[in-house]
From Swiss-Prot:
CDD domains: Maf. Nucleoside triphosphate pyrophosphatase that hydrolyzes dTTP and UTP. May have a dual role in cell division arrest and in preventing the incorporation of modified nucleotides into cellular nucleic acids. Gene3D superfamilies: 3.90.950.10. Its EC number is 3.6.1.9. The active site is at D76 (proton acceptor). Signal peptide: none annotated. Its cofactor is a divalent metal cation. It holds the Pfam family Maf. This is dTTP/UTP pyrophosphatase.
Amino acid sequence: MFINHLHNTDIILASGSPRRKQLLEDAGINFRIHTKNVEENYPVYLQRSEIPLYLSKIKAHAVKADFPDSLIIAADTIVVQRRDVFNKPGSAEEAKDMLRKLSNNMHEVITGVTICYGEKERSFYDITEVFFKPLSETYINYYIENHKPFDKAGAYGIQEWLGMVGIKKIQGDFYNVMGLPVSKLIDELEKMFNPELELNQINSNRPEEPNKYLYFGI
């Protein structure tokens, strides 16, 4: 079973996020943390789903350079509302502005993940739609003053107070909003350690060929 391979593999989480650390621990994966300071800039022509993929690859490759024989897991999360991309707020005012825009609206949370292991590399992303109720200025100010969400894309954590009282519904993976789509990550790790699994999946999704020997008579 591929889980046994994971227990015998040096796994590095290339992220300092406490949420990603918690999620990997809860998934039963043994790992250590190593981060590198990288410029989180991206080309302006990238599509929104490509942005976190691009940044996760930069993070993964930076750590892989120091630990070429380890399995590296890197991730990046952005919040998107129409044409606006929300990263981590740099100030309380910026956080307030983000939450005012998210209030009574739907936005998408997109997490890109890159896994590197030797010559193998896999990248994927997941999208979750989040619907906020109307957020009063009192709620916004209270949350920012007490929870200081300056390390979170979109200026909120779904697992925190504002997520509990302010989110009306979500469509997609809850853990993706926390910063790591664990179910997809496990699937991709299993494919990495068991290539036949991916081949079987491709074959099972392939449409059936038409019957070459089916004839219609008149």
